[in-house]
């Protein structure tokens, strides 16, 4: 009888402890969103590369910890190549400026781009095999690009101007089975750390590990001696010896040493002399192929067949005026990319919104029902107001190009462009089907008598509140005054 009793007691204690830990963890997560003040954030860290610049926001900002995300802004010079990398956190990229090509390596997908045999060259007595690789996609200004968790990708600027992109890493996403620390794994090169704040935390844990008694280190000294050469380089291959890599890839020792990139000082964006030579159809041909693929995807959907990851569309342009979901000729326009328009976002559980406000244009008070949002100013200037559940304005300031503002879930927000120029901004959202509720629409959907008693209004005032003015969320003050 004692053994079953002890087993039951142990199980009860385990469940109780797990519940307490889960409750404590959930409390800590929720406590991070108790924001009495929100700040407009700008990049905190810069990494200069041979052919570009990488800027990151400190992930320890309370606003970013609340949203559970990290952000990177990259500037890639013409002929610049951002080296292959991946992250345990899904990424959503917006192209602010320029154009280029991107390549993803999707597991289990065929290498559908093949070099014709007629183009193969001879080197001495040996024939060079024609190249083949997975599909390469073009992108341009205004594109949203979805990168799934753990999928390696590279980016190349084939344009004449710098390529500027901002990336959101959803570190709190269910796909990330690690902690909320932003991590970027580079397959090649010797890149500088992009989030130095997280490196400091990792170094502290490393020092704690080395402070353990000798008996608990498990042959650590021997491992340190064997991996002395592995201390150079910051790519994932830098952690393996040249000899091991030579055996693994069946290559020469010199090639294996280059794979480790121990003395490469170019960082994560390198210059490609003479331009990148890849197999890629011309722009018009590629557009025709994408239209055909889109048609096939539509037919598969009607037949009840799911898309495979190999055929999923990863980009969509949301900055074109004709793409607008909401439009007011005097106030501005709003375009949305979610899992309904770009199905791959269903796996990332992310979405985006592009807003263009003309001079003095207003995006009326609204809130995100099921998502945190991050507002990044692309161009222009304006004013943003955010109100919390206590009715306090936690943010009421001017915003300018390059600034980031976090809007927590259900906090009411309103934006207005300045008098001198418009306001153009992107909103990342932590839900693939983020829903928005507008205060104005709520009033129109509420019975008049409810509003009269709630606000102490006369019937005429209620009618004016419900029916006058613009019926959409985009408002221009002058047109509103004329309608009244």
Swiss-Prot record:
Molecular functions per Gene Ontology: nutrient reservoir activity
Alphabetical list of PROSITE patterns matching this protein: 11S_SEED_STORAGE (PS00305)
InterPro entries: 11S_seedstore_CS (IPR022379), 11S_seedstore_pln (IPR006044), Cupin_1 (IPR006045), RmlC-like_jellyroll (IPR014710), RmlC_Cupin_sf (IPR011051), Seed_Storage-Functional (IPR050253)
Region (Disordered): 109-141, 196-236, 275-304
Domain Cupin type-1: from-to ranges: 38-257, 316-463
Disulphide-bridged cysteine pairs: 33-66, 109-310
Signal peptide positions (record): 1-22
Cited SUPFAM superfamilies: RmlC-like cupins
Keyword match Protease: no
Protein family according to the UniProt entry: Belongs to the 11S seed storage protein (globulins) family.
PANTHER family documented for this protein: GLYCININ G5 (PTHR31189:SF63), OS03G0336100 PROTEIN-RELATED (PTHR31189)
Function description: This protein found in the seeds of many leguminous and non-leguminous plants is the source of sulfur-containing amino acids in seed meals.
Record protein name field: Legumin type B
Annotated source species: Vicia faba
Organism placement in taxonomy: Eukaryota, Viridiplantae, Streptophyta, Embryophyta, Tracheophyta
């Amino acid at each position: 009888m004692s053994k079953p009793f002890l087993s039951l007691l142990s199980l009860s204690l385990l469940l109780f402890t797990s519940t307490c830990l889960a409750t404590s963890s959930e409390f800590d997560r929720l406590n991070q969103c108790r924001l009495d003040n929100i700040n407009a954030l700008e990049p905190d860290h810069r990494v200069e590369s041979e052919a570009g610049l990488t800027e990151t926001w400190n992930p320890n900002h309370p606003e970013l910890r609340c949203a559970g995300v990290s952000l990177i802004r990259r500037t890639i010079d013409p002929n610049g190549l951002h080296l292959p990398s991946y992250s345990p956190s899904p990424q959503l990229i917006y192209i602010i400026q320029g154009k280029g090509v991107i390549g993803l390596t999707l597991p289990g997908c065929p290498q559908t781009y093949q070099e014709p045999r007629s183009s193969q060259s001879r080197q001495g007595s040996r024939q060079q095999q024609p190249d083949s690789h997975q599909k390469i996609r073009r992108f341009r200004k205004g594109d949203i690009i979805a990168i799934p968790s753990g999928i390696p990708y590279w980016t190349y600027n084939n344009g004449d101007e710098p390529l500027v992109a901002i990336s959101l890493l959803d570190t709190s996403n269910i796909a990330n089975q690690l902690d909320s620390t932003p991590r970027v794994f580079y397959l090649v090169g010797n890149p500088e750390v992009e989030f130095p704040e997280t490196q400091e935390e990792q170094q502290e844990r490393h020092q704690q590990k080395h402070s353990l008694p000798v008996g608990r280190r498990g042959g650590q000294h021997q491992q340190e001696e064997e991996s002395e050469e592995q201390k150079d380089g910051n790519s994932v291959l830098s952690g393996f010896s040249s000899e091991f890599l030579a055996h693994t890839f069946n290559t020469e020792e010199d090639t294996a040493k280059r794979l480790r990139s121990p003395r490469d000082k170019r960082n994560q964006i390198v210059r490609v002399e003479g331009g990148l030579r890849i197999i890629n159809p011309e722009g018009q041909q590629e557009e025709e192929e994408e239209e055909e693929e889109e048609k096939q995807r539509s037919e598969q959907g009607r037949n009840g067949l799911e898309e495979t990851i190999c055929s999923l569309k990863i980009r969509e342009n949301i900055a074109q005026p004709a793409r607008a979901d909401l439009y007011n000729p005097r106030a501005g326009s709003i375009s949305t990319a979610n899992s309904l328009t770009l199905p791959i976002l269903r796996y990332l559980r992310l979405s985006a919104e592009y807003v263009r406000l003309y001079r003095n244009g207003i995006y009326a008070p609204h809130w995100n029902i099921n998502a945190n949002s991050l507002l990044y100013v692309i161009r222009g200037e304006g004013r943003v107001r955010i109100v919390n559940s206590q009715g306090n304005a936690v943010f009421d300031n001017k915003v300018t190009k390059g600034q980031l503002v976090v809007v927590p879930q259900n906090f009411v927000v309103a934006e207005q462009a300045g008098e001198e120029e418009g306001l153009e901004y992107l909103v990342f959202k932590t839900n693939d089907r983020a829903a928005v509720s507008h205060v104005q629409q709520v009033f129109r959907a509420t019975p008049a008598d409810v509003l009269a008693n709630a606000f102490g209004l006369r019937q005429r005032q209620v009618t004016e509140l419900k029916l006058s003015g613009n019926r959409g969320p985009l408002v221009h003050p002058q047109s509103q005054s004329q309608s009244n």
